[in-house]
Amino acid sequence: MPNLLEKTRKITSILQHSVDSLETELPYNTMASRLADIIDCNACIINGGGTLLGYAMKYKTNTDRVEEFFEAKQFPDTYVKAASRVYDTEANLSVENELTIFPVESKDTYPGGLTTIAPIYGGGMRLGSLIIWRNDNEFSDDDLILVEISSTVVGIQLLNLQTENLEDTIRKQTAVNMAINTLSYSEMKAVAAILGELDGNEGRLTASVIADRIGITRSVIVNALRKLESAGIIESRSLGMKGTYLKVINEGIFAKLKEF
């Protein structure tokens, strides 16, 4: 059986595995699964708003009603508010406690059910909660040490990812601003008309048709597209007689055009 040191190493090794995006569905499922295996429990990770980021069920404990929370990837507001008031790890909470993960209707089925909640912090901010639970068997001191380490590891992962996402957003906004600043009034008018032709973020357009409709030359449209493409705002591909295929890869351009 792995000792505390071996389990700790397994948890800290999670930092070597990156989470690509918080936008993906349940980005922390793999992490929750690894934590559940190491600590031998069910586990879930939620953010500050109660959105489910990942979970792992080693043991059946929930009713259909609670399973719906996991399927919807959102915990009830009342539970989220109660969890947000946990500032230090609360261990071995009984099924009678308001923070129990066990539903009211299953208290008789799992009278020995125990829940442990650990707040997740990063950069001095509350980022979410790590919740683990068992049908019975208290979480030992060794288990709770692993929980503290786990919440720290998850906090580092979340903070790093949020920082990366923020940096990416800033880069995209900067690219849009720089591209917009190179456009003349006529080119801005052309860009607004072009993007208005798209079906969502991509589509086919004919430059000459747009030019005639808004009263500018085709060369203005061509120049505007070239500037946007060189700035990494769009991708384009000639379709010959059918026109040009266009795809927006930096959606910040849409918000910027609303200011035009």
Curated annotation (Swiss-Prot):
Pfam families referenced in this protein's UniProt entry, alphabetically: CodY, HTH_CodY
Keyword DNA-binding in annotation: yes
Superkingdom assignment: Bacteria
Stretches for region GAF domain: 1-159
InterPro entries in the record: ArsR-like_HTH, CodY, GAF-like_dom_sf, GTP_trans_reg_CodY_C, Transc_reg_CodY_N, WH-like_DNA-bd_sf, WH_DNA-bd_sf
Family: Belongs to the CodY family.
Name this protein carries in UniProt: Global transcriptional regulator CodY
Species of origin: Streptococcus pyogenes serotype M3 (strain SSI-1)
